[in-house]
From Swiss-Prot:
The modification N,N,N-trimethylalanine is found at A2. Myosin is a hexamer of 2 heavy chains and 4 light chains. Does not bind calcium. Non-regulatory myosin light chain required for proper formation and/or maintenance of myofibers, and thus appropriate muscle function. Keywords: Methylation, Motor protein, Muscle protein, Myosin, Phosphoprotein, Repeat. It comes from Bos taurus. The gene is MYL1. GO terms for cellular component: contractile muscle fiber; myofibril; myosin II complex. This is Myosin light chain 1/3, skeletal muscle isoform. The lineage of its organism: Eukaryota, Metazoa, Chordata, Craniata, Vertebrata. The modification Phosphoserine is found at S71, S97. Residues 48-83, 125-160, 160-192 form the EF-hand domain.
């Protein structure tokens, strides 16, 4: 056997330089908040309605200035029979900061176009919508939901309600088994 020769291995070819990384995609622009132009809203309420609305508005005036804070606008809107979400209220207010919600005040003349904008919104839930939503929780298929489960849902999902609000809403609605007839419950809510 012949002695092994020291065979030189060919030098490894230089690794190709990695391709330059593509430029990062531009960050998506934050979604533009739709702003409602309150000056363009035509007031369609009668003089009598406006007088009634002003009377209710002034019930929320805590300082005697004929003004309310932005944080009270949702309460006044709801007291006048509309049912806007908190997001809709903030949108009609121009998406103010939390500090502005408690510090800024508006007069009735500024409030009226907001009420009209919310009143014009036809995207309000109907009786059937609410019943259908609660039917999901009707495990027995007997037209009732557990009061404890409904309390949990109202306090933790969607536009979360405070415990006191849930209790006020559900007062007198449960039967002796802790169940709530959800069709009667929806009628109760919609009549208020």
């Amino acid at each position: 056997m012949a002695p092994k020769k020291d065979v030189k291995k060919p030098a490894a070819a230089a690794a190709p330089a990695p391709a330059p990384a593509p430029a990062p995609a531009p960050a998506p622009a934050p979604p533009k908040e739709e702003k409602i132009d309150l000056s363009a809203i035509k007031i369609e309420f009668s003089k009598q309605q406006q007088d009634e609305f002003k009377e209710a508005f002034l019930l929320f005036d805590r300082t005697g200035e004929c003004k309310i804070t932005l944080s009270q606008v949702g309460d006044v809107l709801r007291a006048l029979g509309t049912n806007p979400t908190n997001a809709e209220v903030k949108k009609v207010l121009g998406n103010p900061s939390n500090e502005e919600m408690n510090a800024k005040k508006i007069e009735f003349e500024q409030f009226l176009p907001m009420l009209q904008a919310i009143s014009n919104n036809k995207d309000q839930g109907t009786y059937e919508d609410f019943v259908e939503g609660l039917r999901v929780f009707d495990k027995e298929g007997n037209g009732t939901v557990m009061g404890a489960e409904l309390r949990h849902v109202l306090a933790t999902l969607g536009e979360k309600m405070k415990e006191e609000e849930v209790e006020a809403l559900m007062a007198g609605q449960e039967d002796s088994n802790g169940c709530i007839n959800y069709e009667a419950f929806v009628k109760h809510i919609m009549s208020n």
